[in-house]
Amino acid sequence: MADSHKINFEPVDIEMDVREDENILDAAFRQGIHLMHGCREGRCSACKSYVLDGEIQMENYSTFACNDAEVDEGFVLLCRSHAFSDCTIELLNFDEDELLGGIPIQDVRTEVLAVEPKTRDIVSLRLKPVEPGKFDFKPGQYADLHIPGTEEHRSFSMATTPSCSDEVEFLIKKYPGGKFSALLDGHIQVGDEIALTGPYGSFTLKDGHVLPVVCIGGGAGMAPILSLLRHMNETGNGRPARFYYGARTAADLFYLDEILELGKGIKDFQFIACLSESAEGQVPGAVAVEEGMVTDVVARHESAIAKTEVYLCGPPPMVDAALGFLDANSVPKDQVFYDSFTSPIFDQ
C-alpha cells in the first residue's frame, strides 16, 4: 500500500489525502473535490498551482504548460504531480462553486447507437448509457472513451446536454493513425459496447454571469460549443450569444440548420461561418459566410470583445491565435475559457 499524505489547499482551506502512487488531481476527484483542470495530461496549464510547502515531483509534462523557470520557482501541474510529504498548495485558478459542488466522476457502460460521418473528417458517435442508465455532466464538459480491448482511452467533448438522457453524442475528428478515430471506419458497429469515464473539464457556462457570450470554434471544437448553445436554448438563458466557426471550405461545415434553429431561442444570436480557403460552396441561405481566418472575422465584428465572455475550442493553432488576439484586445483572463484539442503525439 502506497504511503499517504495530507494536502492543504489555500486560499480555500480544503484538506484531502493523496497516495504517492496517484496524482493530486485524481486524488481530488476521488474525494469529490473538483479542481480546475483541462487536458489532465500536463499540456494545458489549467491546473497550474504553487507549492507553498512540501515535496512534490512531476512526471511527463509539457514545458509549454509549465516551463523550467516556473518549476524552479515552485509551480506545478496538479495532473502530473505526486506528493511525497504533507503539502500546502496555493490554487491559482479555482471556482468556489465547483470545488465541492461538481458532478462526481462516473464509470458508465454504453452501447453504440450510431456512427455517422458529418464531413470528410468529422464523425458523430452516439452512445446510449446502459449501466448506469444515465450519464450526468455539465454542458461543455468531456469524457474519456476507452479503446475496446486495451487499457487506453481518448478524451472527447459531449455535444449533447444532460436533458437528452437516453444518448450522448461526441463529434470526433479523424486523424491518420489515430487509435480511436481509426475505429470509426467500420470497426465500431451499432450495438458495440464502449466504456466511458467522466465528466471532466471546466469549459462550462458560469452561473450568475451576465456578459454576452462569444463562442469561437473549429473542427471537433463544435462539440462543446454545440452543447453550450443547446443548453442556452433549453434553459432560456438571457445572455446574448455569437458563434464564429472556423473551417477551410463550405464542405467542412455541418449542423448548420440545427445551429440556426437553436439560435431562435437564444437572445440576439448570430452565427458566422469563417472559411479560410474559399467562401464558395453551397450553404443554407440564412447562414452568414465570410472568408478569412476565424480570428480575423472575429476582429471585424467584435470591437467590444473585452466586454464579453469568450469560449474557445478547436485545434491548437486556432486557439493560440485567438488567445493572442484576446490578449491584444485586453480581454480579462477570467473572461476567457478554452479547450485546445491537441495532438501529434497524443493521437486521437
From Swiss-Prot:
Keywords: 2Fe-2S, FAD, Flavoprotein, Iron, Iron-sulfur, Metal-binding, Oxidoreductase. [2Fe-2S] cluster binds at residues 39, 44, 47, 79. Its EC number is 1.18.1.-. InterPro entries: 2Fe-2S_ferredoxin-like_sf, 2Fe-2S_ferredoxin-type, 2Fe2S_fd_BS, Beta-grasp_dom_sf, Cbr1-like_FAD-bd_dom, FAD-bd_FR_type, Flavoprot_Pyr_Nucl_cyt_Rdtase, FNR_nucleotide-bd. Its cofactor is FAD; [2Fe-2S] cluster. It is an enzyme of class 1 (oxidoreductase). Residues 5-95 form the 2Fe-2S ferredoxin-type domain. Binds 1 2Fe-2S cluster. Residues 105-206 form the FAD-binding FR-type domain. Induction: By acetone. Transcriptionally activated by MimR. Pfam families: FAD_binding_6, Fer2, NAD_binding_1. One of its GO terms (molecular function) is metal ion binding. Belongs to the bacterial ring-hydroxylating dioxygenase ferredoxin reductase family. Reductase component of the propane 2-monooxygenase multicomponent enzyme system which is involved in the degradation of propane via the O2-dependent hydroxylation of propane. Reductase catalyzes the transfer of electrons from NADH or NADPH to monooxygenase. The propane 2-monooxygenase multicomponent enzyme system is composed of an electron transfer component and a monooxygenase component interacting with the effector protein MimD. The electron transfer component is composed of a reductase (MimB), and the monooxygenase component is formed by a large subunit (MimA) and a small subunit (MimC). This is Propane 2-monooxygenase, reductase component.
